[in-house]
Amino acid sequence: MTQVSTPVRTRFAPSPTGFIHLGNIRSALYPWAFARATGGTFVLRIEDTDVERSSQAAVDVIVEGMKWLGLDHDEGPFFQMQRMARYKEVLAQLVARGQVYPCYMSMTELDALRERQMANKEKPRYDGTWRPEPGKVLPAVPEGVQPVLRFRTPQGGSVIWDDKVKGRIEISNDELDDLVIARPDGTPTYNFCVVVDDIDMAITHVIRGDDHVNNTPRQIHIFRALGQEPPVYAHLPTVLNEQGEKMSKRHGAKPVTQYREEGFLADAVVNYLARLGWSHGDDEIFSRAQLIEWFNLDHLGKSAGQYDEAKLRWVNSQHMKLCDNGVLAGLVAEQFARRELLVPVDERLARMCALFKDRCSTTVELADWLSMYFVPIQASEQDLAAHVTDAVRPALQTLRDKLAALASWDKASISLCIKETIATHALKMPLLAVPVRVLVTGRAQTPSVDAVLELFQQEIVLKRLQSV
């Protein structure tokens, strides 16, 4: 079990530059679950410094996706663009301490340096031309050039941290060049802003994708330059798509909210995503409450998780079986609304859900089944020819007459009518039940025919049986 000595504070810090997919949202789920499991605080931070690509629409999609999945944040959303004055204040502190310095090297010079290094089979990196050192003569400052500010990365030694997923990581400082932390216009860069945010928001645990591992040693140096110890890091392996590629919009990933439209339950998606990189023994199906009870960082997986839609559909089907029928009724009504069909969310719809949900893996499939109750049906010619034969028509007429005479439309009365008809015509149950299903529901296979008929309005059943 993960031991924590101070109140846990985690964060999800997406960039609003496009829709959010399952691979992204897992980086929200785990810090949310860890905060909830430890009684901590979950912070939402929007890293919107890429002004050209960021949009309010993308922010709205992030918030909507998190809201649907129930990943509620305790603080935020905080926007980096609204914190620029704070970043510049902290940057001035580093300047005053001599921990950053101006660099006037042009992009042309940097490109030429990089080409020389690559030609010599060296790692491309800034060579410290403008880094002040005792006794070093710096180049003449070019006229009319605004410098970037670079951070003085410690020389010699290494950066070490105990990653909660990857274990002990050590990176030599000689591998790191002097990071640009402010652009020529004075705007702070990503790695600097992140550290200031994490300090100001008192983040104790950073749980994020392993594409950030290379940023971590740089951020640790900035933390320590500001007199702070870094948080605990947990770098999550990549989520792969079904083709084994990194999940991304380019490779066909869907927006999180599309899963809602396709009939997946939020709790099922949370369950599936949690298992895509974390485990609690052999438990495959669990509730949100169980996830919170069980979640810790010690059982995060070290290998990439691969998305499998068939498995997600199976998980969803299990959650549908467990789902409250009244809740399902509301979700099915939303599916009907997308088809421009207004269906009341009432006890009758809940009973329909109870009867048919075990046959379905999504609420879209459940709405497909239940549409027989609300719109005209059309049985296939094949089913009509196979089951509604001349031999059974007299029995169908007898059953219709008995059903028409019922004063009480309930399962027991309908069942009695069916049994009496079978006895009168010396039939076996399937020889009557299947043609009734075909005529009334449009399908040859359904749950128990008396239970199915009970949920119809009596006059609709009589009208559909009249077609014989």
Swiss-Prot record:
Motif annotated as 'HIGH' region, chain positions: 14-24
PANTHER family: GLUTAMATE--TRNA LIGASE (PTHR43311), GLUTAMATE--TRNA LIGASE, MITOCHONDRIAL-RELATED (PTHR43311:SF2)
GO cellular component: cytosol
SUPFAM superfamilies noted in UniProt: An anticodon-binding domain of class I aminoacyl-tRNA synthetases, Nucleotidylyl transferase
Top-level taxon of the source organism: Bacteria
Residues holding ATP: K249
Compartment annotation: Cytoplasm
Function: Catalyzes the attachment of glutamate to tRNA(Glu) in a two-step reaction: glutamate is first activated by ATP to form Glu-AMP and then transferred to the acceptor end of tRNA(Glu).
E.C. no: 6.1.1.17
Pfam families documented for this protein: Anticodon_2 (PF19269), tRNA-synt_1c (PF00749)
Family to which the UniProt record says this protein belongs: Belongs to the class-I aminoacyl-tRNA synthetase family. Glutamate--tRNA ligase type 1 subfamily.
InterPro entries: aa-tRNA-synth_I_cd-bd (IPR045462), aa-tRNA-synth_I_codon-bd_sub2 (IPR020751), aa-tRNA-synth_I_CS (IPR001412), aa_tRNA-synth_I_cd-bd_sf (IPR008925), Glu-tRNA-ligase_bac/mito (IPR004527), Glu/Gln-tRNA-synth (IPR000924), Glu/Gln-tRNA-synth_Ib_cat-dom (IPR020058), GluQ/Sye (IPR049940)
PROSITE patterns, alphabetized: AA_TRNA_LIGASE_I (PS00178)
Name assigned to this protein: Glutamate--tRNA ligase
Residue window of motif 'KMSKS' region: 246-250
